[in-house]
Structure formats: C-alpha cells, structure tokens
Design a protein with these regions (language model features):
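Surface-exposed peri-terminal alpha-helical interaction modules
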Residues: 1-142
Length: 142
C-alpha cells in the first residue's frame, strides 16, 4: 500500500474528475456552476453528520456538546449563504448559455437540502425544549 498523502487521503484523482460539463464546447461558467453545487452537496452531507451528533448529544443529556455542534452548524450555514456571492458572479446570459443542457435538473431536487432544512428546524425545536426544561421555563415547551 502506498504511503498516505494529501491527494490519496482525499481521493483527489477521483474528486477532480467529477465535474462533467454538458455543453459542447464547454461554457466557461458551467464549471463554476457544477463546483458550487457539488460543494453545496458536500456541506449538506457534513450538516447531516453534525445533526446526527446533536441528536446523540441530546439523547445522552450532553447539552454543552450539542451547543458546540450547533455553533458549527451555524458556521457551515454562513458558508453556504456566502457561496451565493460566488454564484452571483455568473451573469444571466452566461447561465442561459448552458441551462438548456441541464434539462429538468434543478437544485430544488436536492434531497439532502430538504433533509437538512427539516433537521435544522427539528433540532432547533428540540434544543429550545431541552434548554427551557433545564432552565425551568414552562412557556417555551407548551
């Protein structure tokens, strides 16, 4: 087995071949579009991983661990929002130059995005309920 390197630990050889523009010839901004959306999906995967930890921490009564992980989730969400700034550097005409090749594909089809939104709202409600109970606040839990 070869020694562990940055490239083989991250499987960069495979990762960097996953961007497959459909336009011919390739439209320049299509690569940006693909990478932004693949990055979103990777962050969604990480958020799901973090929500699992929050759930485990709550179930075990580790409120401080859950709070720490919530802070990480918040930071990841800030990154997701900031990525919109990069996407907005693409002009409408640039996007329309390859949009038809995407056929019916849309970011609204992201299952991970919907699961993250659902878990974020459920985790927040669970956090409020547990924190309120720990503080003896009944109004927040009724």
């Amino acid at each position: 087995m070869p020694p562990l390197t940055y490239a083989n630990y991250l499987d960069l050889e495979k990762l960097l071949t996953l961007q497959k523009p459909r336009s011919t010839p390739a439209e320049h901004d299509e690569m940006l579009f693909i990478i932004i959306h693949q990055t979103y999906e990777l962050w969604f995967k990480q958020l799901l991983h973090e929500f699992e930890k929050i759930n485990r921490d709550f179930s075990a009564g580790h409120l401080f661990g859950a709070i720490h992980t919530f802070k990480r989730v918040r930071t990841i969400m800030k990154v997701l929002v900031a990525q919109v700034d990069i996407l907005e550097t693409m002009t409408p005409s640039s996007f329309s130059s390859f949009r038809d090749r995407l056929e019916t594909a849309s970011g609204f089809q992201s299952v991970q995005c919907f699961v993250c939104a659902f878990l974020a709202s459920a985790a927040t409600l669970n956090f409020i309920t547990v924190a309120a109970a720990a503080l003896g606040i009944k109004e927040a839990t009724s």
